[in-house]
């Protein structure tokens, strides 16, 4: 596909434990002739949460994989985080973003809401009272707090999402995507806030040398 006329870039979604050195070297070669973005599913920086959701790789491995990718500055990285994971507080969700953007040389971020789907283990946890779903107000507040600490040079690719209605147990308010987006904008305006207004500047090795 990359040799087809008109193809100017490639975007790959994967896991930190699925990128051996030879794959990264191949992506580095591609990045010399087209735009290359690698999207990494991090979801959380907390190991206890990782164990609960069976992520099966550590935050340490994620950090190391980002470093290996960014040895090649033309490879851009987009990280995925999920708000509302089991046991995570508002403060932990904000900390997930803080760690993600200060520990790692990333160029983009996608922020998701936990969608509870049918035929999952979390469905049982929810019905047995071990999982609480976020309200729209809670989600809007945490997203705005996260946006404030994300440096302005990092591209926000997503701040909410949706799921198939026939498979979604909750939160049902997430189906009204534009309502959620409008609520986030309204809250940012109420605060007089913008992306990165509380961000801490972080300098990475490849930025010092380019």
Language-model segments: which ranges?
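Conserved strand-turn element in the central/C-terminal portion of the radical SAM core barrel
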Residues: 45-47, 69-92, 112-118, 125-133, ...
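Auxiliary Fe-S-binding modules of radical SAM enzymes
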Residues: 101, 107-108, 115-210
